[in-house]
Amino acid sequence: MTESPTSPSGTAPTAGAFLDDAALGRLRPLSFAVAYRMLGSVAEAEDVVQEALTRVSQSPDVRNPDAFVTTVTTRIAIDVLRSARVRREQYVGEWLPEPLVGPGSSLPVAMAAPSPDVARHAELADDLSTAFLVLLETLTPTERAAFLLHDVLGFPHSEAADVIGTSEVAARQLASRARRRIARHVAPQQVATQDEAPQHAAPRPPGQDDPAPDALTSRPRTASDRARAEELVSRFLAACEEGAVDSFLELLAEDVVLAGDGGGKVPLGMSIARPVAGRVTVARMLASFVGRGAPLHFERALVGGEPGLLIVADDVVGGGLIGTWSFEVSDGLLAGIRGVINPEKLGHLGQLADLDRLQAALRSALEARTAARRTAARQTADQEPTEN
């Protein structure tokens, strides 16, 4: 389907002027925001943005630049995602989205708000969470596009259909199917999809959908929710500094899940191969990680628009970013902890740590602790009375 340089439901253009560099520059944040939500990859999103803006720059008389760049970006991203899904199926370990850190990250466009002409029902910074992007990975490319266009960006189904290249009925079905897929991964009582609404609910006008439930994004939605999330992260940071299992236990939900993404690119022992579940197991693993004497520290940051932590190497091993931790909060406790330490997913955030140097420091710390324990054991044995 050929893109029209208008809004998805606009009229045919006439020959005339092209958008200048300044106008294209203003479109870049919106294009990136759409591409990143479609792909969960900064590098892939940047490639899509470059291609989309090139196509837009070659189209005369673009009457609705925001809608047009959204259309072009989405169509390119659908094709990219189809091939990316094959690669992700062969990924080593758990695949997690590339984190965005801000404000003040090296990608300030990630926090930019779009024109209200397109994103009239959403803030682009309001659906960046790792938990939300992980849920989107359960969708097919066209389901993901239909859901984002309608439920996040506020496109009518008719315009979303034009973007995707299908009928309005099919676009509506894609978005509905996306909600049902996502609903399987959140508490059933939190979600009532269009096809599964309670019988006592008031009837909807014909053709009207339920908005996407807040539960689908797993984000703090009120000031008190945000304050609770910030408090939990502060207490988690204190637990990391203390290193005691009990300090973590009081913060974790019973069914908490800890997931790590090293992509097979980090030294053995610095990442987990598959997610770990359960309050006690996760607490012990966290205490073990922070208690190894590694030359690293944690810094508060917004990760995916939510309170999170950066894992940073100390200057003694050259400094640099090791990874990020993002958190999912449910009922006032941490229900999900996701760490990304694959260096190929962190390069956009600045200087990275030298993992080989960090691993060597970890080995030295382990050897020192082992030697200290042996020395203490010998001293204890020497002090014990001997039998005559």
Report residues per predicted region.
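Generic recognition of short, well-ordered alpha-helical interface segments
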Residues: 231, 243, 277-281
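Low-complexity, glycine/alanine/valine/leucine- and proline-rich hydrophobic stretches
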Residues: 280-368, 386-388
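Active-site-adjacent scaffolding segments
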Residues: 1-238, 244
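Long, low-complexity, intrinsically disordered segments
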Residues: 374-388
